Amino acid sequence: MATEQIYKQFTSRTLLNFFEVAALTDGETNESVAAVCKIAAKDPAIVGVSVRPAFVRFIRQELVKSAPEVAGIKVCAAVNFPEGTGTPDTVSLEAVGALKDGADEIECLIDWRRMNENVADGESRIRLLVSEVKKVVGPKTLKVVLSGGELQGGDIISRAAVAALEGGADFLQTSSGLGATHATMFTVHLISIALREYMVRENERIRVEGINREGAAVRCIGIKIEVGDVHMAETADFLMQMIFENGPRSIVRDKFRVGGGFNLLKELRDCYESWDSVGVSPDTSP
């Protein structure tokens, strides 16, 4: 019979499989980023690390020489951070530079302040920003950070999510990890509804426009829940909500990520590595 400890280890292993650790504070250095990357790349490796663009070249060209295991994790460059007030041109250039340096994915913050001030104008700015950045990102993954904790009300969160989807977002991310409020169940609920309704509209558009060529379908879109430095139990609650809201088929890396801080990553690792069953080794397969 499974014990409480086994359930905890199973939960930690599951969360590690979808985890992205953030190293985005103003005080980050090559040394601090290296420490985060090395723990991120331990077996079983997490999805990746989110960093400012200035650190992408260091990770991809220098750190991998002394820690080759780091080559196995994704590097996501966070652009338009931390204020979210850049123009589409400047943010696109920032993304281009990060991609040239070796970034695998881009994480783009919206102008949440403008969204609060004038919703209609904020929506237009989100669509334009996301569409322009997506042009340079191309087939690589573009996550759009909605800063749900900063947006003033459920309607604004929903409209920001829809605008990001219409601009071409590959992932909707609840928050940046830098604000006072990270993911909430309410924000995840609203984003899930926005995504489901968008997928229905897009499928109907494809049907009505007669786009019936083989393989025609709405692009794959995911949700990233940024939890900050909460504990494993709270993070597991978001995993269960994701399954409840979007179904078990949504729990794949192309559709689901969990973002968090270094302390949460260490807690997940410590729990997983506490396995002590005699004669039994934990499964380390991806």
Curated annotation (Swiss-Prot):
SMART domains: DeoC. Keywords: Cytoplasm. SUPFAM superfamilies: Aldolase. It is found in: Cytoplasm. InterPro entries: Aldolase_TIM (IPR013785), DeoC (IPR011343), DeoC/FbaB/LacD_aldolase (IPR002915). Its main location: cytoplasm. GO terms for biological process: carbohydrate catabolic process; deoxyribonucleotide catabolic process; deoxyribose phosphate catabolic process. Disulfide bonds: none annotated. GO terms for molecular function: enzyme activator activity; lyase activity. GO terms for cellular component: cytoplasm. Homodimer. Interacts with ADF; the interaction enhances ADF activity in disassembly of filamentous actin and inhibition of actin polymerization. Involved in regulation of actin dynamics. This is Divergent deoxyribose-phosphate aldolase-like protein. The gene is DPA.
